[in-house]
């Protein structure tokens, strides 16, 4: 949350501290930090502004930015989270605003590990002729299965019967029984 000082945008803008400008600088700094993320760490940072002010003729005194940070390892997303926080602190400092950062836990990264032979065999039997595809390594998304994988072995699977990308406009169920 970025906090500034409201003032009339036309009559006395110099008396305000624009929280939206501070947040915008934070977003720009975060964007410039992206080149510091190593490709092999699969870091993804997704910020959105959920509150950008109250009225168009008032210098915004509060802006709320929510951000999801993901990575292939705990170290990778911890590093990205620090850079994210630092970016928004810098934006606030530059504009004379204040920033309140609340860090909430997200999902732990998933672990792409070889399946235990007995689990793999059981999956092949239950698949009844449907080909079993080997794990292909880390995927860009995250899910609570990563949390469980850090505690115990987990055998994950996907089904067919769909085309297109998950959470994308082209996603479509093509075979309801298989899906």
Residue ranges and their predicted role:
Residues 126-134:
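A local structural motif
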